[in-house]
Curated annotation (Swiss-Prot):
Residues 891-917 are annotated as: Disordered. GO terms for biological process: DNA recombination; DNA repair; DNA replication; male germ-line stem cell population maintenance; negative regulation of DNA recombination; negative regulation of t-circle formation; regulation of double-strand break repair via homologous recombination; telomeric loop disassembly. This is Regulator of telomere elongation helicase 1 homolog. SUPFAM superfamilies: P-loop containing nucleoside triphosphate hydrolases (SSF52540).
Length: 1014
């Protein structure tokens, strides 16, 4: 790879770096060299991740070389001094002085942190493309993602999995964890390849070794460790994962939300119901202790790590805490009441929770959780969730040392709200009348108390989290994102010394981006999404007409971002009622961002698939949602983004009110904090900047940015937009009449299509790859290029695969191999699949059991996209003139294609795979080939060798075969012959065997043998 000297360090970059990349890498290296901190902004699409990795690892590699030279020098001096009878320790002292600060003695390590594991996976894929791929790396994940023990994985919720895992490890009953010591040096695990979460799980399954604990074995020797934010910023998580930060380089990527993350990591909440359940749980354990037949009660039989006296004392403290919470006065029953930070210490002090006994009580609570995890396997006991809530409260509240209480009082507030409780019977009802320590105490109905409360301990100073980070003696902290500006308020809030800062311009030319403020719609109605105007029918109609007119011009993908889910739903309802929705969906199939994580991945894959159609697709989402924060809509996936309004936080939200009040109270000329109103405006604009960043993703990308709110003309709003966007708006941004904008927009895309290099068709797995629920009717395509589909992921799929592998696949299927000139215009393929031959039903398990569809011309069905996407009923007649989905029963779904019959012959080639049965074969006309073993590669090859109509038929037949009986196998065989029957394609026909149901393989072999002999 080309080598560039940047800030005196040789950096190997995949190609000659652009100027913005050189500037970025220079700032990174200066931070590392000087041991200082940096805040660096570089727009999305400028190769920020690649620049971060190459510059930091180049500096590390240089330091490693220097360290090796110094150690050799030390050894030589030791030998010389010993030869002359001198002391060897003097050489060590001299060398330590020459190397400067004590924390410079060793070679620093890099911690690369980002918000999500899918972002970390993308970063690791970037690392694989560099000259530094051989450097040692590891990624840290949660048990939820890495655990392969079946008993742990069947637990619901991450906290239950954590405690079940701890229990099995403590009891030495997890065979996977016990193998870590013997398998941790296995070549498959210690090999040179970079392993992400998915790779760790696969290696762990192959070696029958715990990936979670095995990954920790790599941390001490890793040059770079990838982890999510919470592992880094949460002191408890750092301790649990044994993360050593001294002399470490900390890179916080996607740091535009770092203030909120720091505040949330220092905040905590407890409810009256949590305390009441903790009392019940302690009571249950005490009953087990005192029961005469406790050995037969189904409870755990091993010796306890606590005594009845411990339980008695804890219950007394909990009862006092419950009493103290009940005594808190809430003057405003709707919005709640705010108290100073000292109130939380007074509240806990009444129950004797103090700095002195906090650690002891937390240790006891952890033991009780472990105890209940065992007991819950034999009875209906809860699993100690209330103890975990109390433990979190104590850990957060007492993490702030007594000597900084003045700062705590300035930065924290206690906000008390009324808790809505449900009338439920207390657990252990048969003994509810008991008194004394086995009873519920004086307040026996506390679970259903009408005055149950929520105690919030909120932090409003993100500097707390960053200060804890800096106190660990890190070498450098580098914050970077595409949307950090304005930098001064960010630096002021985080309260860290920053020596290097950067606001990079974008790498694209002016001609590649069209940015306009649209202040009025086609009907000249003002477009302004403020609180007063949001219910205005004229505004909603005008906004819809604006989107409709833009959708007629924008090719391929169109993104529309709303300020909130309620606003999105309100517009959809209005457009549905007026008929505008039908007009919109006739131009482009419309996808709505789902709130649920399970539906999100499948929706994204369906959108990417719909982009392949000539009409493209429209995705409507919300600012601050999953789509706006982390996904890539490069090239055809996103040619324009419409921002329908400014996503201000809820004005009357107690947390927003208190944050604004905190800033106003603590703002001085010296600290340069924002005013409350400035923060409020900036919070909205940063969300807009993130949404805008979804579109222009690389050097040769192009697109339009349309700001459909008249308030974007305000100078205060414009100044908070990213620097590269401001450059397109000019010195005095003004909204333009709608007519000229339409003409300019049409001309922009016409010119771009003529002058810009157009990307090749993306390689995307067909819709039949989507994971679907088996037990619910779902939405599946009838394989018409004009249809749009929605499906939900299946509950039977491994959760890691659902949450991590599929999320990464949705993003990576859309990503571009950025910054490699030869590949710039080619879309990236899907991630490499395992080379192991897939299980037969693994292929078919991704096909849906029922086929239903959406008619986008029928506005009554819009709620399918809007909420849970329940399947519609099939009572509409179908017309050929409109784009719609058909409701098709699984038995009628696949019909023999014209020109085929059940009497057709079948083609085959022999295979050497162990799964195949050998057949006598005639000499082939074409050289024998082997079908790809990977399911994804197999489908891509089929798609590449047959026309689109046959591939759709192929998909329909596979779907029907998955859900149907033996008759569907007959239909599938006819279809396979039609699609893959040509002599040169018979290797693919033979490769289909591994994906058939076991009961059909023998018949398949007989027919292939018969064909080959004919």
């Amino acid at each position: 790879m080309p080598e560039s000297i940047i800030a005196g360090i040789p950096v190997h970059f995949p190609f000659e770096p652009y100027e913005v990349q050189r500037a970025f890498m220079e700032k990174v290296i200066m931070c590392l060299r000087d041991g200082t901190n940096g805040v660096l902004e570089s727009p999305t699409g400028t190769g920020k991740t690649l620049s971060l990795l190459c510059s930091s690892l180049a500096w590390i590699r240089t330091r490693q070389s220097e360290h090796q030279i110094n150690m050799q020098k030390l050894q030589m001096e030791q030998q010389q001094r010993q030869a002359t009878g001198g002391s060897a320790t003097g050489a060590i002292s001299d060398l330590a002085l020459t190397m400067g600060k004590a924390n410079n003695w060793g070679v620093p390590k890099v911690i690369y942190a980002s918000r999500t594991h899918s972002q970390l996976t993308q970063a690791m894929r970037e690392l694989k493309r560099t000259a530094y791929a051989s450097m040692r790396s590891v990624v840290l994940g949660s048990r939820d993602q890495l655990c392969i023990h079946p008993d742990v994985m069947k637990e619901q919720g991450n906290s239950n999995k954590v405690n079940m895992c701890k229990l099995k490890v403590h009891a030495k009953t997890c065979s996977f964890q016990l193998r870590v010591e013997s398998k941790k040096d296995h070549p498959d695990f210690r090999g040179p390849s970079i392993m992400d979460i998915e790779d760790l799980v696969k290696v762990g399954q192959r070696l029958k070794m715990c990936p979670y604990y095995a990954s920790k074995e790599l941390v001490s020797s890793a040059d770079i460790t990838f982890m999510p934010y919470n592992y880094l910023l949460d002191p408890k998580a750092r301790k649990a994962n044994k993360i050593e930060l001294s002399n470490t380089i900390v890179i916080l990527d996607e740091a535009h939300n770092i203030e909120k993350i720091c505040e949330e990591s220092a905040s905590v909440q407890i409810r009256s119901s949590d305390v009441a359940m903790a009392i019940e749980d302690v009571t249950h354990i005490m009953k087990i202790f005192t029961s005469a037949d406790s050995q037969d009660s189904g409870g755990p039989e091993e010796p306890k790590d606590f005594t009845l006296d411990d339980l008695t004392l804890l219950k007394e403290m909990l009862l006092e805490l419950e009493k103290a919470i009940d005594g808190v006065v809430v003057e405003n029953q709707v919005e709640g009441t705010t108290y100073p930070a000292a109130h939380i210490y007074e509240l806990l002090g009444k129950a004797n929770f103090t700095y002195g006994n906090c650690a002891t009580i937390v240790a006891l609570l952890d033991k009780l959780v472990q105890y209940l995890m065992v007991a819950s396997q034999h009875s209906m006991l809860r699993k100690g969730g209330s103890f975990m809530v109390l433990s979190d409260l104590l850990n957060v509240v007492f993490a702030n040392k007594e000597d900084i209480m003045a700062k705590v009082h300035r930065s924290f507030k206690v906000h008390v709200q009324i808790e809505d409780t449900k009338q439920t019977k207390p657990a252990g009802n048969s003994n509810s009348k008991q008194t004394g320590w086995l009873g519920k105490g004086n307040n026996a109905t506390s679970t259903v108390s009408k005055t149950a409360k929520i105690i919030n301990f909120w932090c409003f100073n993100p500097g707390f989290g960053m200060e804890q980070l800096l106190n660990t003696q890190v070498r450098s902290v580098i914050l970077t994102s595409g949307t950090l500006a304005p930098l001064k308020p960010l630096i002021a809030e985080l309260a860290i010394p920053v020596a290097q800062h950067l606001e990079n311009p974008h790498i694209v030319d002016q001609s590649q981006v069209y940015v306009k403020i649209i202040g009025t719609g086609p009907d000249r109605e003002q477009l302004i999404s403020n609180y007063k105007n949001r219910d205005n029918p004229k505004y909603i109609s005008s906004l819809g007409q604006t989107i409709l007119n833009v959708s007629r011009i924008v090719p391929d993908g169109l993104l529309v971002f709303f300020p909130s889910y309620p606003m999105l739903n309100q517009c959809v309802d209005a457009w549905q009622a007026s008929g505008l929705w039908a007009d919109l969906s006739s131009r482009k199939p419309i996808f709505l961002e789902p709130r649920g994580k399970d539906q999100f991945t499948s929706t994204m894959e369906e959108f990417y698939q719909a982009i392949r159609d000539s009409k493209g697709a429209c995705f409507m989402a919300v600012c601050r949602g999953k789509v706006s924060e982390g996904l890539d809509f490069a090239d055809r996936n996103g040619r324009a983004v419409i921002i329908t309004g400014l996503p201000f936080p809820p004005l009357k939200d107690p947390k927003v009110i208190l944050k604004r009040r905190y800033l106003e109270t603590n703002r001085t000329k010296e600290n340069q904090l924002l005013s409350g109103q400035e923060w409020y405006n900036l919070d909205a604009t940063r969300a807009v900047n993130q949404a805008i960043g979804r579109v222009i993703r690389h050097r040769h990308d192009y697109g339009a940015i349309l700001l459909c709110d008249a308030r974007f003309q305000d100078a205060s709003q414009v100044q908070q937009l990213s620097k590269w966007i401001r450059g397109h708006l000019g010195a005095r941004p003004q909204s333009s009449p709608f007519g000229p904008i339409v003409r300019e927009l049409r001309q922009f895309f016409k010119h771009a299509e003529q002058t810009m290099v157009q990307p090749d068709e993306r390689v995307v797995e067909p819709p039949l790859q989507i994971v679907c629920k088996e037990e619910q009717p779902t939405l599946t395509p009838s394989y018409n290029s004009n249809t749009q589909i929605k499906r939900e992921p299946g509950s039977g799929v491994n959760k890691f695969q659902l949450a991590s592998e599929l999320a990464a696949k949705a993003e990576m299927a859309n990503s571009i191999k950025s910054w490699t000139p030869a590949d710039y215009v080619n879309a990236a393929g899907c991630t490499n699949q395992s080379q192991t031959a897939p299980n037969a039903m693994d292929f078919m398990s991704r096909l849906n059991s029922n086929v239903t569809s959406i008619d986008f011309n029928n506005t009554d069905l819009v709620k399918i996209h809007k909420r849970e996407r329940s399947s519609p009923t099939a009572n509409e007649s179908l017309t050929s003139g409109k784009k719609r989905f058909k409701l098709i029963s699984s038995t009628d779904m696949v019909k023999t294609e014209p020109g085929t019959s059940n009497s057709c012959s079948y083609g085959n080639t022999s295979s050497s795979g162990s799964d195949s049965r050998c057949c006598s074969a005639k000499p082939a006309e074409y050289p024998l080939k082997e079908a790809p073993e990977s399911r994804a590669d197999f489908l891509r090859e089929v798609r590449s060798v047959v026309d689109s109509d046959k591939f759709r038929s192929f998909g329909k037949a596979l779907l029907a075969y998955k859900t149907g009986g033996d008759n569907c196998f007959e239909v599938l065989m006819v279809l396979l012959l039609d699609v893959l029957g040509a002599p040169k394609l018979r290797y693919l026909l033979h490769g289909m065997r591994r994906y058939l149901k076991n009961e059909h393989k023998e018949e398949f072999d007989i027919r292939l043998a018969s064909l080959q002999a004919s």
